[in-house]
Regions:
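Aromatic/hydrophobic beta-strand junction motif of beta-rich domains
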Residues: 32-38, 117, 186-190, 553-560
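Short, solvent-exposed loop/turn segments enriched in Ser/Thr/Gly
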Residues: 26-30, 43-45, 180-187, 239-241
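Domain-core and long-helix interface of multi-subunit machines
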Residues: 316-324, 341-343, 348-350, 354-469, ...
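Ser/Thr/Pro/Gly-rich, low-complexity intrinsically disordered stalk/linker tracts of secreted
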Residues: 1-169
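A metal-dependent hydrolase metal-coordination microenvironment
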Residues: 240, 255, 261-397, 493, ...
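Short S/T/G/P-enriched beta-strand
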Residues: 1-17, 153-194, 198, 258-270
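Short, solvent-exposed loop/linker segments at the N-terminal edge
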Residues: 20-27, 40, 176-182, 541-549
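C-terminal functional module detector
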Residues: 173-177, 193, 210, 216-267, ...
Length: 752
């Protein structure tokens, strides 16, 4: 780490009260006492107490002694101190930091500074602890005793362990598609209010399947000290859809599992869920890489994982450790673990790319060695790839795949793309939703699949809640269509683009194209120069084919994890049709106000939608919020006719549903900083009324919905004419009532 290493043992010491185990998201008051070391602290010298980049600890403030986060500092000798709460003014990963400057007088050796985070002496409720769990949450203390602004980390900094709170949200997880007669597992867990799997639940529950599942007990027990329950060796003998309802012993429904489809034993492809993009505390994440993989396997219950640390922080030792861990965790038939890294270049030279290797032991080509300073680690600097074109050149002939994504910095796929290596673009992560990246690829004529991942920094891959900071979305998942669960099969799924993306839910999606005659099918984009590998008249998502036919029959089947709101069918950039499982006659006294979009593509993309609405000539019977992941936000005030809320989006969307007392009488008006508007309620229908708000795909929409929605399945078939020349690129986007979305990878049909 590029801090000064000058005599850390002489820099002083720090202690913290209380220490030990602290509940995530709880309100606390911490007292940190720093005692000056051999040099004291000179006039204009300072301390920094650093916190990791992703943390939502705090925020710290100094002006209101009765408000949350009030923080004070006092010098034992009366020296005057200056306090600042800074973001990105400390070297990563300790990006958030409290600056404590000695601005008058100085500290002698043995003098102390007492810092109270969440000082309750004048009425503050304290400071909120980070909302996600961490084995060692560190108050990282750096000292600049000689006033050089060259900080030295203390040899030991205070730390606490952040643990989950009581469970409040039950989750039941099944696979999405299995073959009849093949064994599978059912997982049950309870998350606390911030999305951490809780080990505090001790309760017996009943399990009821919608169709027979061999080996499923009538009851199971969650035991305190364990993070849920898992039942293995289950089987279903007959094809069809099923789910499991979980109830308490009084019969109250706690949760319903995602849908499971049991298919014929001879079915070629089944479904596996993955999150291949996130990182741990060796780079910019939370908890160790071992903890990271274990969480995805044992607490999120996903099938496929990758680790994507920022390359300019990955030392040779950590690269070896990552490869050792992926080899250890990778167990064919149980869990696929993929080695890789995030090529983390600036957007100007290509932007972020995920690099996934099929095998361990590959060389890493970093975008730079920006935070790697050890001389031994600098030995391979000559292998760096400073822009995306150079990256693709260095990866030629390597057994790997690449995906473009949007994180803090975003990928510019128009700067460079390799048709053989770059097989996907990431449409969604905890950073937000980025359909513009898909459109960038389609505008350039690239033939890529669509994936989604968490890009998580909070140690919760596969179940990544954004917490209370600047992350705006629940993390995404990718469903891989593969014949079996092993690394070779998953890599084939990646290379053939046979996967679909979701914003974190587990639902079933099939897209199939049928042609009247055989088409030439390509494994790789023919832009690579590769020829066809066979012929077929039946194609699925991700397939690329050349055909002489003039039309295709497209079949789409969806089994949602919640009722389906709409399905949008696209040919590349063109919306062909929107299908809803309801019509105008089904609409009830329910209005949805939807807000969506971002400021722009870069890091400061967050749009604040804090606002209010008023119903005129009607009354609000009930209201709820969609896609509100931050408990600090949400509906804040509600009367019979008014409602105020706090919300943000980062390219994704949120919504407020109103159930009205008097049908379609009256009107509704709303006001937010980006846009305001009004409409007659009777004038609203299934098609949204849109109020544009500038920025990046930013708008508010008003629409009416059925009072109650129950239809979780949607099946349709369409005959679609193919473009006379070039590509027809068919894919769908599905939106559920609860706000989750899905995207299929396109089917590419080429006519010369």
């Amino acid at each position: 780490m590029p801090y000064s290493t000058f005599r850390p043992e002489l820099m002083g010491r720090a202690r913290l009260e209380p220490s030990g185990r602290v509940e995530a998201g709880s309100w606390q008051s911490f007292t940190l006492v720093y005692t000056a070391g051999r040099f004291g602290i000179d006039d204009t010298g300072s301390l920094k107490i650093g916190f990791r980049f992703a943390t939502d600890f705090g925020p710290v403030q100094f002006t209101d002694p009765k408000a949350p986060g009030y923080t004070t500092a006092e010098a034992s000798n009366g020296a005057t101190l200056e306090l600042k709460w800074e973001f990105k003014r400390n070297i990563r990963p300790w990006s958030r930091s409290l600056y404590i400057g000695v601005v008058k007088e100085f500290l002698a050796p043995g003098d102390s500074i007492t810092i109270r985070f969440g000082d309750r002496r004048q009425g503050s409720p304290g400071i909120r602890v980070q909302t996600y769990c961490e084995r060692e949450f560190e108050f990282k203390v750096f000292a600049d005793p000689i006033a050089t602004y060259d900080y030295v980390a203390l040899p030991e900094s205070p730390r606490i362990e952040i643990v989950p709170g009581p469970g409040v949200r039950w989750q039941a997880l099944l696979p999405t598609r299995v073959r009849a007669g093949e064994p599978f597992a059912f997982a049950l867990k309870v998350d606390d209010k911030w999305g951490n799997p809780s080990d505090l639940t001790n309760e017996e529950v009943t399990l009821k399947a919608s169709s027979p599942i061999l080996g499923l007990p009538e009851t199971t027990r969650l035991v305190g000290g364990k993070f849920g329950a898992r039942i293995d060796a289950l089987k279903v003998e007959k094809s069809g859809l099923c789910h499991i309802d979980v109830s308490d012993t009084s019969g109250r429904l706690l949760c319903r599992s995602n849908p499971l489809e049991v298919v014929h034993p001879a079915s070629k492809l089944v479904h596996f869920w993955g999150d291949t993009h996130g990182q741990s505390n060796e780079t910019l994440g939370t908890n160790s890489a071992r903890d990271y993989f274990a969480f995805g396997r044992d607490k999120a219950h996903i099938d496929v994982m990758g680790h994507q640390g920022n390359d300019f922080q990955i030392t040779r030792a950590f690269w070896k450790e990552l490869n050792r861990l992926t080899a250890e965790f990778d167990v064919p038939g149980r869990f696929v673990c993929i080695p890789g890294y995030e090529w983390s270049a600036n957007t100007a030279v290509g932007g972020d790319r995920n690099v996934h290797f099929r095998h361990e032991g590959e060389a890493i080509h970093r975008s730079s060695h920006a935070q790697i300073t050890d001389a031994a680690d600098m030995a391979d600097e000559g292998a760096d790839a400073h822009d995306a074109r150079e990256l693709f050149k260095r990866l030629q002939g390597r057994d790997c795949v690449v995906a473009a994504h949007v994180g803090g910095r975003y990928a510019d796929i128009t700067f460079a793309h390799d048709a053989r290596l770059e097989t996907a673009v990431e449409v969604h992560s905890a950073w937000g939703t980025f359909e513009w990246l898909v459109r960038d690829a389609l505008e350039k004529g690239f033939r890529v699949g669509i994936c989604a991942n968490s890009d998580g920094h909070k140690g919760r891959p596969g179940a990544c809640y954004p917490g209370a900071s600047f992350f705006g979305s629940y993390g995404g998942l990718t469903c891989f269509l593969a014949p079996r669960l092993d690394r070779d099969a998953i890599f084939e799924s990646m290379r053939s683009r046979r996967h679909y993306a979701t914003t974190g839910n587990r639902a079933i999606l099939d897209v199939e194209a049928r042609l009247a005659g055989p088409a030439d099918v390509f494994a790789a984009d023919p832009a690579t120069g590769d020829g066809p590998v066979g012929t077929a008249n039946r194609l699925i998502m991700g397939d690329i084919a050349r055909t002489r036919q003039s039309e295709v029959e497209l079949s789409i089947a969806v089994a949602g994890s919640a009722p389906i709101l709409r399905l949008d069918l696209y040919d590349g950039l063109e919306l062909i049709e929107t299908v809803r499982p309801y019509g105008e006659a089904d609409l009830g006294p329910r209005v949805r106000l939807l807000y969506s979009g971002a400021e722009y593509r870069g890091r400061a993309r967050t749009t604040t939608w804090d606002g209010g609405l008023e119903v005129h000539g009607n009354a609000i019977r009930r209201a709820s919020m969609i896609n509100n992941w931050n408990l600090d936000r949400g509906i804040k005030e509600q009367t019979e006719t008014t409602l105020n809320w706090k919300a943000v989006t980062t390219g994704n969307f949120g919504a407020i549903d109103l159930w009205l007392a008097r049908g379609t009488e009256g009107s509704i008006s709303f006001s937010t900083k980006p846009v305001s508007g009004s409409a007659r309620i009777a004038g609203l229908g299934t098609d949204p009324l849109t109020f544009e708000a500038g920025g990046l795909e930013r708008h508010v929409q008003l629409m009416r919905l059925p009072d109650t929605m129950t239809e979780c399945r949607l099946d349709l078939t369409r005959k679609i004419p193919l473009r006379p020349k070039g590509d027809t690129r068919l894919y769908v986007r599905i939106e559920q009532e609860d706000g989750f979305r899905m995207w299929s990878s396109p089917i590419y049909l080429i006519r010369d």
